[in-house]
Amino acid sequence: MVDVTIKRVNSVYNEIICDRGISMELADEFTFMVPGHKFMPKFKAGLWDGKIRLMDLRNNQIYSGLSKKITKFCKARDYIIDLDSSLGYAEFSIIEAKEFIKSLNLPFEVRDYQLKTFVQCVRQNRGLVLSPTASGKSLIIYLLHRYYNFPGNPTLLIVPTTSLVHQMEGDFKQYGCMDHIHKIYSGQDKDMLCDIAVSTWQSIYKFPKEWFDAWGTIIVDEAHHAQAKSITTIMERAINVEHRFGFTGTLSDSQCHEMVLEGLFGPIISLVTTSELIEQKHLSPLRVKCIVLKYSDTQRKEASKLDYAQEMDWLFKHRRRNTFIKNLALSLKGNTLVLFRYISHGQELHKDLLDKSNDNVYYVAGSVEGEAREEIRKIIDTHENSITVASAGVFSTGINIVHLDNIIFAAPSKSRIRVLQSIGRGLRKADSKEHCTFFDVSDDLTHRKRMNFSLRHFQERVQLYNKELFDYKIYQVNLKE
């Protein structure tokens, strides 16, 4: 007798047919506390318990991408399970994949892990691909587009920024794409339908379900942003889009975040890591230099009473701290990227650098138009000594700069995704590039037994460096009053 039946409802949801007891077990298994819920207004107001429930007990529906995890759950409890035949794996061999790739006449060889990732995606018909920076993610996306692109099955490629709209178009043309690539972002036509469209998610998330019915395949780059309600809304509205893939360089350590992504896109596909790519010489060698700035007893005492926002404001306005970052950037050889989080801090650093060097100093933030950002990116790649002061939110995601030698992480962050993405900006290989150096700037304002936020976040980053097997060294620098 079957205990659990997984029945396909549409491309987004499955229905779980079972008795009430098993339903409650499954609902509990797929319920998670949302990270940071204690600081959210609804939780503070007592309107929400801080949990996200992926299984709806009103209709026993759950994201279809979680079928594999539900099957594992049932087998662990000896439940007999019946899986809808439409949810199974497709037959697609390595040999078939190689023949298909050969027919594309690509300008270079597809790496082994790229081939295997492509095959796994096709077999599953969906998937969440963990693809480190410079692992050739855009080529895998291109292969999927060409494989699924037949009459009546156009591809919608969703990226987080207008810079990536232009960059993805350039990558596809480099691979030999002859199709017209329609770009959708602010000020562009959103109703034109063609073989492939590249769009920012901000441009389309308010569109009705009917608009998404026109697409046969949806691919989301930087899919970890799906924790934002807008991308979740897009994927939930695309109820008839069977081929769906998410690509990301990393996931947060939150189980809730991971489960939502798998639910929307499918099982995780991870076939290579950053350290493996460095070892295989596909990426530049990485050196992480952790610089811990030390402050006077007077300043430690002054900062000991500050909350997080106040500490960040105190640090970013600290004259000697900003001078240290400026001098560090000016002392480095090669192209340097200085990443900031707050606009006022970035503007101050940019002004300081311009006062000392008017040549090849650039500024990039959300206010800079996408085409202008792309021009700056191209300029950097043709220079040997430039400094770009850039918003971490804009430049840590997906921007492809080959000739980048140094990165200065000027603003504290404990976000695993943000840190790994920032490091990833400098790992692409170039003929004149020996390695990439990542400068992790943190602050020791410890007073008595109280450890400040910047130092706490630094300790979490060190744990990340150890986990990722990055080569790092810690240096302490005294900032004189």
Task: Tell where the protein language model's regions lie, with residue ranges.
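Walker A/P-loop
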Residues: 123-146
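Post-DEXD/H (motif II) to motif III coupling segment of the RecA-like Helicase ATP-binding lobe
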Residues: 216, 224-289, 465
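Conserved segment of the helicase C-terminal RecA-like domain
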Residues: 425-459
